[in-house]
Amino acid sequence: MAPTKYFHSVQLQQDKCQGCVSCVKLCPTEAIRVRNGKAEILGDRCIDCGACASGCPYHAFTVKTDTLEGLSKYAYNIVLPAPSLYAQFPANIPLEDIWQGLQNLGFDEIFDVSLASEYIACEIEKYLQEYTGGRKPLISSTCPAVLRLIQVKFPELIKQIMPVLAPVEAAAIYVKKEAAERRHLPKELIGVWFISPCPSKQTNIRQSVDVKQTELSGSFNLSEIYGLLLKNLGGEKKLHVRTGSSYGLAWGAYGGEIASAGIQEALSVHGIKNVYEILEQISMNKMPQLDYVECHACKGGCLGGILAAENKFVAESNLRKRIHNLHATEPDSRKETMAQTMVLEDFPKSEQYRKKLVPRPMMQLDDDIMEAMKKFERMEEVLCDLPGLDCGACGAPSCQGLAEDIVQGKAHEIDCIFKLRAQVHKLSQGMLELARQIPIYHEPKFLNNTEDDNQ
């Protein structure tokens, strides 16, 4: 059963909000309203995709992440850099310098997430080979914002989600167990940290939708870590970190999952609006020819996350150069290339740690079913009387959203400017008619005489 209270890393600073409704129109789940000149987030609908934050001209939205002070809570700290971090730097900066910079910031150990990506890619490939009889395409499970979007708007597609862990979750499970055994430490004293390019991954650490128990201790804002790394890159000691191949590195950009799993009939889509449109098509069973759809809420994939420091096009160029340079040193065969790096023992299998997604109840008009039906009928009546322009001037994202708010007692019909104008016109016509019925006033004669006497 879905929780009734949700944690959100995307938060609104109302003092900065100007009530411009830009965020209202951008939100894919209609989770924002503007009331009394300020935006409000509806927590049961928000999926922490960050679309509101990326489109707010007043920077009224912020993302709550962890700080490096949190390292002091643990005896041993492991950081999980992903390709999205490497992409912030030009390809001529060695990964060893970035890893050394992370150690200079206080981390004891580094584990490259791209290596975990290859294990997950193999799980995806195997599952597709054995998948028979069910609806296609299957939908990638690596983006938490997409999973939440499906929970809220497309619950019928939950059964088509690929049942594998996100690489960072699998990496966290592996490194904490392995480090605890190697360092002879209880797991509670080991901190495992992610450097996140987006808010949805931070939210998933605090309240996961697909992992029974995350082993991640928290995550840091990628742009903040990037700024610190610029001052701490490299050093005399060069760290050796076991890393993945070019196929694991490719997961940072859109299309990387498909390439690493060797899927032919597949589609890669990025940007929450585009993802929404594709999910609508899948929901109507219009893409049965596809085996797999790779979805990223952020434009450009994880490289376009709102917490990234570098422009997403520059970051993509940086990453693809790294991929090209690494691929030039590898065998031609994808499977042979990945076999050279996948040498870890007892890497976790997704089925042991993943939990089943459940729909998230979004629009519940009332706890009492009879009362809910009455409200629904009333909502339909109100909606029929609204203009249907979905202009957003009322503070709701659509006329249907306003109708729902009205029956819930959270808005009024005259919040619609067209209804307000009609009401004002009706009142003015009434006042005009009333004015016509009032007798014409004549000044008493003695007033005029008084004025003449004064002269």
Question: Across the structure, where does each feature detected by a protein language model lie?
Answer:
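Iron-sulfur cluster-binding cysteine motifs and their immediate structural context
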Residues: A2-P3, S9-Q14, Q18-L42, I47, ...
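Short gly/ser/thr-rich secondary-structure transition/capping motifs
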Residues: F7-H8, C122
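Iron-sulfur-associated redox domains of electron-transfer enzymes in respiratory
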Residues: T62-G392, P397-Q455
